Amino acid sequence: KALGIEVENNVKLANATNPNIETIRNSIIPTQLCQVKSNTSYSNDFGIFEIGRVVKGLDENNLCIEQKKLAITLFSKVKDIKTLYFELRDMLVVLSEDIKHKSLGFKKAEPTHSYEHPVNLYTIMIDNEEIGTIGIVHPTVGKKLDKKASVVFAEVDMNAFTDAQTAPIVYDEPSKFPPIDYDISVVVPEKLFFEDLSKCWIGKGEGILKGTKIVDT
């Protein structure tokens, strides 16, 4: 409550000894934001993570729908919000590429929790399946954590990530000729993602085009 995060309606413990633990959490992020608040005086730049379980309501048998989640929250007074956000994004990308040998996708998401930013929130995708969210904390919550700090978070459904098929490792024969990098400047619509743009050259330049990446925005 000190952070302005509302306690959402969810499964409750019967005969709870403390009203603060009565409602079972449906997300790990609020817990991490409280942990961040408790540690802001110890460091200007840090991150925390947790693999834990949450409950998303009840099933048809009136039993708790339990989900295993990976939650990561980064806090920094020395990095701007863009740098911190892409640092978290890169953590998730490396995790996916090292374990599943696949790239992640992202699409715009609508906030469903009071701590989520109304604009800067995205769904994490793998094989066109939703596995989590990544975003910036709501400005109101961020100011109560620290007025000068940047705070970003991500939460991944571990079961959905585990269920994704692992791609085989493929080795390409080294080129006989030295590689050449080309810098190309393009102007794209404001809401166009690089993932969508990259579909334009899939299957093109076979044997010549080895890869593409954004070097500046």
PLM ranges: what are they?
Residues 1, 65, 79-217:
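A carboxyl-terminal module marker
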Residues 16, 31, 35-39, 54-57, ...:
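Generic, well-ordered alpha-helical scaffold segments in large soluble proteins
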